[in-house]
Amino acid sequence: MTEPSSQATEFDAVRPDLLHWWVEDDRIHHRSDSWAVVHDGRIVLIDPLPLAEPAIEALEAQGQPVAICLTGSCHQRSAWRLRKRFGIKVYAPQNAEGLEETPDVDYAEGVALPGGLVPVHAPGPTEVHYALHLDRDEGTLFCADVLIQRGEGLGFVEGKHQDDPARTRESARRFLDLKFGVLCSAHGSAVTHRPKDAIRRALEHEAKEGRRPQ
């Protein structure tokens, strides 16, 4: 899948160590979001979307980009172009299919990634699909496509766009065992207030919808 045609012209700081930008993604007719972790003057990009050159320069003023981490092949986005732009490595899941270029490093669940990130296998959207957990301070979870912003809360991607919706819900349930106070999705703003409660509400809503007569 090629990059979105639009570029983000700026980014915002959820916290000093957590940057965010987004675009209206013409490929999927939905909003898409990207994140970056800043630690000790180094920046790790997560599923990066296109950034306009002034925004790239502003990003570099925050620190030195050192790596790109992908949660799955459906989130390649601008990874390969930014790899060349910054001269950094791309980390991608083992056995990810459909990658447009070869990643520098393949990762599996539980290994240490740059920036203190740890991959958590989160199948359902696809089989080779990962969340990234940052166990620093209050904790941050980058949940990729397991949960997305729907209206005022969290929800799930329509079942027809998932490999296995039941496994997606199970992945969401397993997130509740992790330590995090901020939840970051590939499609939506950060959830900074009681994100685990937001996950529980999404699961409860999905269960009610599943019981509703057709």
What are the residue ranges of the model-derived segments?
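Short, compositionally biased "basic patch" segments
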Residues: 1-35
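Metallo-beta-lactamase
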Residues: 2, 19-20, 25-26, 42-45, ...
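Residue-level marker for the onset of beta-strands and adjacent loop->beta junctions
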Residues: 7-8, 33, 107, 128-130
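Pre-active-site segment of Zn-dependent metallo-hydrolases
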Residues: 23-67, 98-102
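Active-site metal-binding motif and surrounding structural segment of the metallo-beta-lactamase
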Residues: 52-92, 181
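Short glycine-/acidic-enriched loop or helix-start segments at secondary-structure transitions
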Residues: 55-57, 78-80, 101-102, 152-153, ...
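Alpha-helix capping/helix-boundary segments
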Residues: 75, 96-97, 190
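Helix-adjacent hinge/juxtasegments
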Residues: 80-121
